[in-house]
Amino acid sequence: HLVGQAVCDNIDERHQQILPDYIYGDGDPEGVRQRAAEELIKTAHAAKEFGVKVINGFTGSSIWHLVYSFPPILPGQIDDGYEDFAKRWNPILDEFVKCDVKFGLEVHPTEIAFDIASAQRAIDALDGHPAFGFNYDPSHFGYQGVDYVEFIYRFADRINHVHMKDVSWSSTPKDAGVFGGHVDFHNPSRYWDFKSVGRGNIDFEKIIRALNDIKYTGPLSVEWEDGAMDREFGATESCQYVKDIDFPSSNIVFDAQFAENSED
């Protein structure tokens, strides 16, 4: 995740705390981006040797600072950002194809894709590159007002991995809104916060049904964050919750079963 963030980001001193020293180096922004790209290519080749078929991560974004359109965005600035993304990621993804490995971008604020519209734009920028897909995580959609179930159907052939992670958002106004108000997580003044799986607002029943509909057979990976709960307890209960709510899809049409029985 963290190395991928540096491929497209506008690099500054914050990145030093999330990157290995051999990637950050002297901190020269373009040097950091190039070393990050090289590391991802090496990761794809390592995955091939281990028989791993999916690598999840971030892409970073040179235009995240433009997410709020003021001062007014200049013509071409957003297009330039997606062109930069394609220029940097196409060579990486070409190596993924050679290794028979797919990339799963966790659609997330600060990335080139952070909702349905921007995810589609990322695909278009890459001309539908076959190695590019998504690590689906509903917790980054719900509080934004993004249809997290529709995302599954819209990108059915590109759901490469699934994070089961929960989030809650308030039904009433709060002091710190969607943008967080520079307030730490687990603060009652926040509009939204991550929760142990099953304790937030995400409808996992709908997610399981949608994943079954698109015939997803990959893992349901619990990603756990809840500032009010003991980690061991939370991780344990979240795993059990996912096991309890998951179910296999039917291989028959319901009405057809009656016709079959009537013939017996």
Predicted regions and their residues:
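Short, acidic/polar
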Residues: 35-46, 144-152, 204-207
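Acidic/histidine-rich catalytic cores of soluble enzymes
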Residues: 79-201, 253-254
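A structural motif
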Residues: 47, 52, 159, 216-217
